[in-house]
């Protein structure tokens, strides 16, 4: 290849030829083309910190259009309204998905209602609910059953503090990987956030720890829950929990996390770790990006740059997906385009999981259910790559009315996931 680029020594003498001027011009362009190629490659390498080679087909990626993905939204409504069982999912948030090897899809849900839906519209204000659940979707896209603990209780069981306060687990991203590195047996690994009951601004729980659950295949039985990281920060807002996204790529799984500065009205800082395939449940195998290289100490993790100010950037539940050779990060903008807060989904792109991330680019204001009258909030945008295609990506988001809990009982649509399909293009 070096010789073809004209960098080898000992060239044969040049010969006079009727096409000489053209050939001479070609010879002059040869070194210039090589120089330009080198500069382009150098620029791409700079796009991927740490000296890692860029993705060969990395391109600046933007969302060019979107439309409602009604089939998925309606499937969750159908399943939730089905009263053939009164101990399964009728609404929830924290909705994430992962494809299983046999063609099924495992959906993960955080706070989940289990109850009867009355006339397809409302639920009893005293409905039973649990801190987490799983949902199994068939190969043909039909939700079939809810995964719970005995009781019914949460699928991933909770704990309690020494003084009796509730400690619960919220499931986040999940992946299918070897049971151990190199093993032929596959299991599901689910990232969990451990949280405990607290007061304002921690009404949604004080962040405590990152854990990983191992779930068997194909029967989806919770086998174990392993502690991964227990942040030592005295300020809960500075504690980084991992798992808002997990992307397998080659020999590694890249796990994304964030602190919780959004509790104080600021953007969260985004972090990334990587783990060898098959080792997610082994805390000793985790490596944390410090801005230049991968470190064994989570305390040395450095935030990835997102947004232009501390008030605009990611929330703690952003999502990351790969599309071709480009990494795409989507989040509810912590600042919003006009400073109004969590209203707009924005995107960033990068040539590697560590960034640098380019953006933000406004994507959409997620549509809310009819009749929400401006009370409802859309949050937790999550990519569902297995439902996308070459030209696009399915994005789900949750809906809630945090200032009026009774509203989600009067109208069950106000606490169910909704979906849109994003068209992606190179910009």
Please give the residue ranges for each predicted region.
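Active-site cradle of extracellular carbohydrate-active enzymes
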Residues: 247-352, 361-368
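Conserved blade-ending motifs and adjacent loop-strand segments that build the rim/top face
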Residues: 86-87, 355-387
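Long, hydrophobic, well-ordered secondary-structure blocks that form the structural core
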Residues: 173-274
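N-terminal regions that are enriched for targeting/export leaders
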Residues: 49-185, 190-194, 206
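Structural signature of eukaryotic scaffold interfaces centered on beta-propeller domains
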Residues: 90-101, 161-186, 197, 236-252, ...
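Surface-exposed loop and turn segments in beta-propeller and other repeat-based domains
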Residues: 75-84, 135-164, 227-237, 285-312, ...
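Beta-propeller blade signature
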Residues: 120-143, 203-220, 269-278, 344-353, ...
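Secretory targeting and sorting signals
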Residues: 3-4, 26-51
């Amino acid at each position: 290849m070096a010789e073809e680029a004209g960098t080898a020594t000992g060239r044969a003498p040049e010969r006079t030829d009727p096409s000489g001027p053209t050939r001479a011009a070609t010879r002059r362009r040869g070194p210039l083309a090589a120089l330009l190629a080198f500069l382009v490659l150098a620029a791409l390498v700079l796009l991927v910190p740490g000296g890692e080679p860029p993705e060969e087909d990395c391109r600046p990626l933007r969302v060019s259009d979107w439309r409602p993905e009604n089939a998925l939204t309606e499937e969750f409504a159908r399943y939730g309204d089905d009263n053939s069982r009164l101990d399964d999912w009728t609404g929830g948030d924290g909705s994430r998905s992962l494809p299983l090897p046999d063609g099924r899809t495992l959906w993960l849900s955080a706070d989940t209602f289990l109850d009867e839906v009355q006339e397809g519209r409302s639920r009893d204000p005293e409905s039973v609910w649990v801190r987490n659940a799983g949902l199994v979707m068939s190969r043909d896209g039909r939700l079939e059953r809810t995964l719970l603990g005995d009781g019914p209780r949460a699928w991933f069981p909770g704990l309690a503090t020494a003084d009796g306060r509730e400690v619960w687990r919220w499931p986040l991203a999940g992946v299918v990987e070897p049971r151990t590195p190199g093993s032929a047996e596959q299991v599901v690994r689910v990232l969990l956030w451990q949280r405990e009951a607290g007061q304002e601004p921690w009404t949604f729980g004080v962040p405590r720890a990152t854990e990983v659950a191992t779930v068997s295949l194909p029967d989806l039985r919770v086998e174990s829950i392993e502690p991964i990281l227990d942040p030592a920060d005295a300020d809960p807002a500075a504690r980084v929990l991992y798992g808002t996204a997990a992307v397998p790529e080659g020999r590694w799984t890249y796990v994304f996390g964030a602190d919780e500065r959004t509790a104080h009205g600021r953007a969260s800082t985004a972090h990334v770790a990587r783990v060898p395939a098959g080792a997610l449940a082994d805390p000793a195998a985790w490596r944390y990006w410090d801005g230049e290289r991968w470190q064994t100490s989570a305390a040395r993790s450095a935030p990835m740059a997102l947004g232009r100010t501390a008030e605009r950037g990611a929330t703690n539940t952003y999502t990351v997906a790969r599309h071709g050779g480009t990494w795409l990060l989507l989040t509810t903008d912590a600042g919003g385009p006009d400073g109004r807060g969590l209203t707009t989904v924005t995107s960033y792109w990068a040539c590697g999981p560590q960034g640098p991330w380019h953006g933000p680019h406004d994507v959409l204001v997620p549509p809310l259910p009819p009749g929400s009258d401006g009370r409802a909030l859309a949050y937790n945008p999550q990519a569902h790559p297995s439902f996308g295609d070459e030209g696009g990506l399915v994005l789900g988001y949750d809906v809630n009315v945090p200032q009026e809990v009774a509203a989600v009982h009067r109208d069950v649509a106000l606490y169910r996931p909704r979906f849109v399909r994003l068209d992606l293009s190179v910009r």
